[in-house]
Every structure is written in C-alpha cells, then in structure tokens.
Regions:
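Charged structural interfaces that engage phosphate-rich ligands
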Residues: 1-419
Length: 419
C-alpha cells in the first residue's frame, strides 16, 4: 500500500509479469491449461488441460494386482443414491451414539452430514521425481475432504487415534525429532566399520492399505488408550470414513474401493498405525541377515519414509529388501543407501550421502554427519523485502534460514559452505 494513501493499492509486480499472469488466468478459465501447485518445492506446474484430465482419468481407472493374480479397481463410479445412503448410515450411527451418551448434542450437530457434499479429486505432480523432458511428471492423487460428508466424523476420529499412533518405537515426529535420535546414536560411540545408511520409501502407501486390515489394526491399538466410549464406536466411524469416500471429478461421482485418501484428516495417523505393524515384521525379518547380531542399529520412520542404520553386509541388505517386498501383498518398498555399488565393501573412505526429510546424512569417521538437503526443484520462494508485510516478518526470514542450517548441519564444514 502507498503510505501516502492507504486506500490506493500499488502492485508489486512489473507490468509485463502482471500481463503474463492475467493471460495464464484467462487460459485456465477457458480450460486451455490448468495450473497446479507442485507436490513439493513450492513451485507450480502448467499443464495442457486435456492432458491433465487424461492423467486423472487414467488414475481413476487404475487397478491393484491381487495375490490370486486377478485385478481389482481402486475406484468405482457411483450415483447420487449412494451418497444419500452414506449420509443415512452416518446419521443413524450418530443418533445411536447420542442416545447412548457417547457424544454430546453439540458434537452430534457438528458431525451431522445432512448438508455436506462429495469430496473433490485432483492431482499434484512430483516434479522432483525423475521423468523424461516433455513427459508429465509422476502424479500424487488427492481427495479433498473439505466440506465432505465424513469431514467432521473424520476430525473426531483423528482426535483419538492420533494419541495412539505416536506411541510405537519407530515413530518420527519431524526433523528435530530425527536430529535428537541421530545425536543419541552418535553419543553411543563410533558405528561399526562399513555401516550403511539406508532410506526406504513405501510405494503409494495410502492407496495400498487394505481397509479391513487397517481397521483391525486400529481397533487393536485403541486398547492402549482410555476412551469415553466403546472403541467399536470409533472404529465404526473410521469404517464409514474409509468405505464411503465418495468424491466428484469432471461432473462424475466415484467411490474409493481400496486404501484411503491423502485428503482425509485421520489418514496420516491411520497409515502410521498400519505401518507400525509392518515395522515390527520388517525388523524381525532383518534378524535373519545379521550374521550373529541384529544388523539394524536404528529404524525410524516418518509416515512412508524409513531411515535405517545397517551394520550387516551390502549383499545381505539387498537380500533383506528382496524379502521385505514379500512380507505384505500390497505394500512395496524402494531403497537408497550410502554404499556405491562399485565400491569395495571394505573401503572405509567417506560414503555418499542420502537424503532423509530435509537432511542429507552420511558417515564420516564412523559418526553420522548431517547437512541441509533441498530438492533440486525447490523454488526457494521467500518474501521480498519490498513486501507489504510487517518489518519483523521479513527481518526474521534470514534468521530462520540461518537457524535451520545451524540446527541441522552437524559440523562446521557443512554449516559454512556456500548454498
């Protein structure tokens, strides 16, 4: 704003950029292009509108390979009566809960689905993932639960299952929690020679969690916390959230048949509880590859990203991953590690680094060293000093960035290098 006239707005973009922006908005309005935020890195991606619709339709037609060799669709087209049936079932369960004193009148009114609408399907694109020039990057499907019939019951469910989803030993809350775990490992003394840092990614976790299996795991986990109502009431709400995930795309209604959507509130906690079981199975499996001792010094997981310190051989690590991909019919893993395939396993030279969260981890002198990691596609979008934001906001940006570097980088060499 002009300080001489607070009622007069002054654009902070050059004229040619404003004209280009207006042209893009016009093209999007006319359905020539679509503009979407990137999955990560704060950038945007501009796609041909028809190419975007085709990508979404292809995903909605995708199928999951079953253990018997058959294929089952992830989604199915439905009609409006299915939406009405979902509302009726939710309302019936809530009325019964109100009569039994499980919920208050205010909670009943807040969760009433009568005026709610279907969810909304869209895709975000993983420009940070490898893809050929000119090709559409891999997509991440999102079903927005905002305003949806299960929105408020899912909030209610999340309030309770989040309390138990953080209790398993492999749980990582965020980067500071990861830093604390690494500091603890380093305080225990040098790592064994030829230790390997490993990052494991779960492929399409949310859409591959079997609904009935996930519900059983949640119901069992709820025994570990105190609830003001029977746990069956909470799992019934979760079941309705999972099995009536109805959404709209391109003027058609769909029902998700397999897995859960990233856009619903309990999805991260639900996935965490499911993966806690997989964590235990995986670590039990790893004991077979330890040559007398358990080869995993550390196993920590942030949702679908797993960090491991492996003290066994490289061959056994690959054998472990091969068997890991057999422990569950729908959950599959990919791996990255700090040992170059062409490097002699006895070579004690510093290993390459692997990214995990927003850190880059390597081993130096048998200790874990951390550096700041940014994806190559990160746009580093920060406020300009000419922005109309309060001065303390813009002044705090360089301090926050410097503090992040100091907090993550574990040695002076990584803190002081140019970025």
């Amino acid at each position: 704003m002009d300080p001489q006239n607070r009622n007069k707005a002054r654009p902070n973009l050059p004229k040619d950029e404003i004209e280009a922006l207006n042209e893009l908005i016009k093209l999007q309005k006319n359905k020539v292009i679509t503009i979407k935020p990137c999955d990560k890195g704060a950038g945007i991606i501009i796609l041909d509108f028809e190419a975007y619709i085709t990508s979404c339709n292809n995903h909605l037609k995708s199928e999951q390979l079953q253990p018997d060799g058959s294929r089952k669709p992830f989604y199915s087209k439905v009609d409006l009566p299915t939406l009405d049936t979902a509302k009726t079932k939710i309302l019936s369960l809530l009325q019964e809960a109100l009569q039994n004193g499980y919920i208050s009148k205010d909670e009943f009114q807040a969760m009433d689905p009568s005026e709610k609408t279907p969810g909304r399907f869209y895709e975000l694109f993983k420009v940070h993932k490898q893809h050929e020039p000119g090709e559409t990057p891999p997509e991440r499907p999102i079903i927005s639960g905002s305003g949806f019939i299960t929105e408020n019951i899912s909030l209610f469910v999340e309030h309770y299952i989040k309390k138990v989803s953080t209790k398993h030993p492999s749980f990582l809350q965020d980067t500071p929690d990861f830093l604390r775990n690494i500091e603890e490992i380093n305080s225990q003394g040098p790592l064994p020679e030829n230790s390997i840092l490993v990052s494991i990614d779960v492929s399409a976790l949310y859409t591959n969690i079997p609904q009935d299996e996930g519900l059983n795991i949640v119901e069992s986990a709820l025994d570990d916390i105190s609830l003001p109502f029977p746990k069956e009431f909470l799992t019934s709400l979760l079941e309705l959230t999972l099995k009536y995930n109805i959404f709209e795309f391109n003027s058609e209604l769909f029902l998700q048949l397999i897995g859960t959507a990233m856009g619903i509130r309990p999805a991260p906690s639900y996935a965490d509880l499911f993966m806690a079981k997989i964590d235990k199975l995986a670590q039990d499996l790893a004991s077979q590859f330890g040559e007398g001792i358990h080869p995993i010094r550390m196993w920590k997981r942030f949702l679908d990203d797993i960090f491991i310190i492996w003290t066994g051989s490289l061959d056994n690590l690959h054998n472990f991953l091969e068997d890991l991909n057999k422990i569950h019919p729908t959950i599959k893993f990919t791996m990255n590690h700090t040992k170059n395939e062409n490097e002699n396993i006895c070579n004690c030279a510093p290993c390459p680094a692997i990214p995990f969260l927003d850190t880059s981890a390597s081993i130096q002198d048998n200790k874990i060293t951390l550096d700041l990691y940014r994806k190559p596609t990160d746009r580093c979008q920060y406020l300009l000093t000419s922005s109309c934001h309060p001065a303390h906001v813009t002044e705090n940006i360089p301090f926050s960035l410097a503090y992040r570097i100091v907090r993550i980088c574990s040695v002076p060499e990584t803190r002081e290098k140019p970025r």
